[in-house]
Amino acid sequence: MEASSLVAERPTGGEQDPGHARCAFYLPRKRRSCGMAPKAGARFCAEHQPGDSGTAARVPCPLDPRHTVAKAQLRSHLARCNRTKQDQALRAEREHMPWYEAGVNSAARPAAAAADEATLQAAVMRAIPVLAQIAEAEFRAPLRVAVLSNAQVEHVRFPQLPSNRKHALQQSSLIQHLREAGLWVAPERPVAYVEFGCGRGELSRYINQAAVLEQLERGGPAAPPAFVLVDRACPRMKFDSKFAEDVAELHARFCPSVPPDERPAPAVTRKKIDIRDLRLAALLSPGLEHIAVSKHLCGVATDLTLRCLAAGPRASLCGALIAMCCRHACNPAEYANPAYVEALLARHAPDMSYDLFFLALMKMASWAVSGRRPGVPDTEVGGHFSGLAIAERERLGHLARRLVDEGRRQYFADLGYDAELLVYCERDTSREDIALLVRRPA
């Protein structure tokens, strides 16, 4: 959208004082004016000059269309664009990154052909009775409901959140599951937690807090775990520096007799890398056991993570706890266990292709989490192409999610691990309430 069409969205009276050298363009999404400096005598910066202002024509930058550049200066801009510098820096770093290998965790399966909406809807209608038949034959036992709570998280985290505790409740349950499953650090058992799709590193931060506080409450010295944080993005307000600050604060509160210079800080390593390209073995310290964790690892990222763990040093992999989400964002070509789905189809619908059935599963999986407007009854159809009431669509959505998740569970079971799907939080806390718990057999 051109600047001239957006200037009108600026609230009345929201123009900058002429004495302030800031662009007068209002950014509706950020609810503030642009912070760039305009040229002398101009009201807007070069990025937000109206198209009819008589200034040189501007075009989106080919490297990053989020910003524009004067058309006449495009060639010189490409040489100095920040995106060019970032790409060059990343390429230079990769030459010294033994943990990077392009596509190492991708599946060898060819990509599924794209389906138009009519084809996809027809596949869904065909898949509905197949899914119901599979669920009746294969998934009659409900998943174990285990909504747990960690005392240390409640002690430290909950007082900071007087109102919205949804994320804290999920973190508390996941952390307690790690403890009860034996996937926990101790002074005599150092481990490294690898958080996939870590974002700001929030889950790892509270694992660190809970582990250190538990050790201090027992009167023993604190031995924080190590952390490896993996994400392809570089979010703002990361928690990386908070790990050491939390350890120091907990010592000061609960064990002040330990001198500050003797309070161990956790080793925290962050890598900006796509899980698709991650060679995990090159990131881990030799001889140190590791545990994979993630909260709401989205769609295909879960499948890439499972393959990454399977290809990594399994001798040191104690287990994993992954809260999954967004099955509608999966990919039939990248799914971790296509053989599992193909075997189900061979028994229940041998004439249906894997790719089309999986695309239908993705579509139906979204029905479980799309939510309802307040007051919508279970019997509401609302013109949906399936002709099914909303309650029935939600039920089928949960069955589709279950099938996708069962294949992931079986993937690790086939590798010799104890693997379980469980409900780790209440549905009104999060609709994405299923976690995959993997443990090395005793």
Swiss-Prot record:
<feature type="binding site">
    <location>
        <position position="61"/>
    </location>
    <ligand>
        <name>Zn(2+)</name>
    </ligand>
</feature>
<dbReference type="InterPro" id="IPR007871">
    <property type="entry name" value="Methyltransferase_TRM13"/>
</dbReference>
<keyword id="KW-0863">Zinc-finger</keyword>
<keyword id="KW-0862">Zinc</keyword>
<comment type="similarity">
    <text>Belongs to the methyltransferase TRM13 family.</text>
</comment>
<feature type="zinc finger region" description="CHHC U11-48K-type">
    <location>
        <begin position="58"/>
        <end position="85"/>
    </location>
</feature>
<feature type="region of interest" description="Disordered">
    <location>
        <begin position="1"/>
        <end position="21"/>
    </location>
</feature>
<dbReference type="GO" id="GO:0005737">
    <property type="term" value="C:cytoplasm"/>
</dbReference>
<protein>
    <recommendedName>
        <fullName>tRNA:m(4)X modification enzyme TRM13</fullName>
        <ecNumber>2.1.1.225</ecNumber>
    </recommendedName>
</protein>
<dbReference type="GO" id="GO:0106050">
    <property type="term" value="F:tRNA 2'-O-methyltransferase activity"/>
</dbReference>
<keyword id="KW-0949">S-adenosyl-L-methionine</keyword>
<comment type="function">
    <text>tRNA methylase which 2'-O-methylates cytidine(4) in tRNA(Pro) and tRNA(Gly)(GCC), and adenosine(4) in tRNA(His).</text>
</comment>
<dbReference type="InterPro" id="IPR021721">
    <property type="entry name" value="Znf_CCCH-type_TRM13"/>
</dbReference>
<dbReference type="Pfam" id="PF11722">
    <property type="entry name" value="zf-TRM13_CCCH"/>
</dbReference>
<dbReference type="GO" id="GO:0008270">
    <property type="term" value="F:zinc ion binding"/>
</dbReference>
<keyword id="KW-0539">Nucleus</keyword>
<dbReference type="Pfam" id="PF05206">
    <property type="entry name" value="TRM13"/>
</dbReference>
<keyword id="KW-0808">Transferase</keyword>
<dbReference type="InterPro" id="IPR022776">
    <property type="entry name" value="TRM13/UPF0224_CHHC_Znf_dom"/>
</dbReference>
<keyword id="KW-0963">Cytoplasm</keyword>
<feature type="binding site">
    <location>
        <position position="77"/>
    </location>
    <ligand>
        <name>Zn(2+)</name>
    </ligand>
</feature>
<dbReference type="InterPro" id="IPR039044">
    <property type="entry name" value="Trm13"/>
</dbReference>
<dbReference type="GO" id="GO:0005730">
    <property type="term" value="C:nucleolus"/>
</dbReference>
<keyword id="KW-0479">Metal-binding</keyword>
<feature type="binding site">
    <location>
        <position position="67"/>
    </location>
    <ligand>
        <name>Zn(2+)</name>
    </ligand>
</feature>
<dbReference type="Pfam" id="PF05253">
    <property type="entry name" value="zf-U11-48K"/>
</dbReference>
<keyword id="KW-0819">tRNA processing</keyword>
<feature type="binding site">
    <location>
        <position position="81"/>
    </location>
    <ligand>
        <name>Zn(2+)</name>
    </ligand>
</feature>
<dbReference type="GO" id="GO:0002128">
    <property type="term" value="P:tRNA nucleoside ribose methylation"/>
</dbReference>
<dbReference type="GO" id="GO:0008175">
    <property type="term" value="F:tRNA methyltransferase activity"/>
</dbReference>
<dbReference type="GO" id="GO:0030488">
    <property type="term" value="P:tRNA methylation"/>
</dbReference>
<keyword id="KW-0489">Methyltransferase</keyword>
